[in-house]
């Protein structure tokens, strides 16, 4: 596969952009190659600057659930851009998207729009602290909630990929208020709560961990968190930046039937444009400025282009049978890859929730960060490169999730399974 132009652009980028990329995992460092520079995308495919076209399972890290360049989304953005890119003032579109989110997500009675998932989680935690009058928070090893200082403690995603769970530049005084439990372990949560009585403001969790691969919650885990928080006066925050509108229209909380106090969103609700949101119970949300005393603001919050793309995307998701079709495609793909590995005699563990899935290069069940971090990352890198040569674009890290979109056809799924079968045989 020719990559001359991508490699040349990467060398140029490294002279003006730190590491040559604007988000670390894009550098392909963990798989030992230069990144692809993308020229265009359409449906479920992306094309790089060297003219190579790939079936895409990254989907811009989750937002592109209806596929790239969906005509309805493109037209919505085009019309919005013709009226002005940003006003720094309220628009009717903000109300429309807010009401769509409120109607969809069980926990959300009011919602505030922001510009990124990091901004959403950072603001939600500030609000939880203001609401409870407490300082400490609990997060989980391997769960990534953005790059805010207090959340870069034993994080997943890019931090896991590079083996840097704690970033330099985060003061110890910030990190000391972040307590870390083990995902899928209620005992570890109970111990932290017992050791820090009446000091925990919130527990923040990815209801399906998607930044250490795809790790589903075990039976009773989310229900147990809900009970602990209710008993102890702790705000339960579901970080659904990834799972929101992905694993169900109402997110993981709809799929699992557990309602948190607050929810953070991003990715899909912007239809591919920069966006985030956080919402929850009215009594909590009304503490936000200007109605309350907890401050939060943003120049581009509620950006009209992002709101328009979000409205168009959520309208598409509401079409009858959308999630049923996506579920079937995703099931077929995950089972096909599992069977391909088994027939090649290659040990992997495949996990899936809705249209999120991961092939862990491990012979052991993965249900927490300890299991995920024990995977054979060298084997994954070999698989990644082999799949890329087959025209299949996966996330360049063992610790990321793959995403299926509505644009993937049965033929795309079958082609991917056949490619995986050849790749497992090649690396076994």
From Swiss-Prot:
Which GO biological process annotations does it have? protoporphyrinogen IX biosynthetic process
Sequence positions bearing N6-(pyridoxal phosphate)lysine: 267
Its required cofactor(s), as named, are:
pyridoxal 5'-phosphate
Compartment(s):
Cytoplasm
PROSITE patterns named among the record's database cross-references = AA_TRANSFER_CLASS_3
Q: Listed GO cellular component terms?
A: cytoplasm
Any one Gene Ontology MF annotation carried by this entry is: glutamate-1-semialdehyde 2,1-aminomutase activity
- Family matches, as PANTHER family: GLUTAMATE-1-SEMIALDEHYDE 2,1-AMINOMUTASE, GLUTAMATE-1-SEMIALDEHYDE 2,1-AMINOMUTASE 1, CHLOROPLASTIC-RELATED
Family per UniProt? Belongs to the class-III pyridoxal-phosphate-dependent aminotransferase family. HemL subfamily.
State what protein this is by name: Glutamate-1-semialdehyde 2,1-aminomutase
Supply the source organism for this entry. Pelobacter propionicus (strain DSM 2379 / NBRC 103807 / OttBd1)
């Amino acid at each position: 596969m020719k990559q001359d132009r991508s490699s040349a652009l990467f060398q140029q980028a490294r002279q003006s952009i730190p590491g040559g990329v604007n988000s670390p995992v894009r550098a392909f460092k963990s798989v030992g190659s230069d990144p692809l520079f993308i020229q265009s995308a359409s449906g479920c495919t992306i094309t790089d600057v060297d003219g190579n076209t790939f079936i895409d399972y990254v989907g811009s890290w989750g937002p592109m659930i209806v596929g790239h360049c969906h005509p309805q989304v493109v037209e919505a953005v085009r019309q919005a851009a013709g009226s002005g890119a940003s006003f720094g003032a309220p628009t009717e579109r903000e109300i429309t998207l807010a009401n769509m989110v409120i109607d969809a997500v069980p926990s959300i009675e009011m919602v505030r729009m922001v510009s990124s998932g990091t901004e959403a989680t950072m603001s939600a935690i500030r609000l939880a602290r203001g609401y409870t009058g407490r300082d400490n928070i609990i997060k989980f090893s391997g769960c990534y909630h953005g790059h805010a200082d207090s959340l870069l403690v034993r994080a997943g995603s890019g931090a896991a990929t590079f083996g840097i769970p704690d970033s330099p530049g985060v003061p110890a005084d910030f990190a000391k208020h972040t307590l870390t439990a083990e995902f899928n372990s209620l005992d570890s949560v109970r111990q932290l709560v017992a050791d820090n009585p009446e000091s925990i403001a919130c527990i923040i969790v990815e209801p399906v961990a998607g930044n250490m691969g795809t790790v589903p919650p075990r039976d009773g885990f989310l229900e147990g968190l809900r009970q602990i928080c209710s008993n102890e006066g702790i705000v339960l925050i579901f970080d659904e930046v990834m799972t929101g509108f992905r694993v169900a229209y109402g997110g993981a909380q709809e799929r699992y039937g557990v309602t948190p106090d607050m929810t953070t969103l991003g990715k899909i609700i912007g239809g591919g444009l920069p966006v985030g949101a956080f919402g929850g119970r009215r009594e909590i949300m009304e503490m936000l400025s200007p109605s309350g005393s907890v401050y939060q603001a943003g120049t581009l919050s509620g950006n009209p282009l992002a709101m328009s793309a979000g409205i168009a995307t959520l309208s598409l998701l509401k079409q009858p049978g959308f999630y049923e079709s996506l579920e079937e495609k995703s099931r077929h793909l995950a089972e096909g890859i599992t069977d391909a590995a088994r027939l090649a005699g290659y040990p992997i563990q495949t996990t899936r929730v809705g249209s999120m899935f991961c092939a862990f290069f491990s012979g052991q069940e993965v249900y927490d960060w300890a299991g995920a971090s024990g995977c054979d990352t060298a084997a994954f890198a070999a698989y990644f490169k082999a799949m890329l040569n087959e025209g299949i674009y996966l996330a360049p890290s063992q610790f990321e999730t793959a995403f299926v979109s509505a644009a993937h056809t049965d033929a795309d799924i079958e082609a991917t399974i056949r490619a995986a079968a050849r790749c497992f045989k090649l690396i076994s």
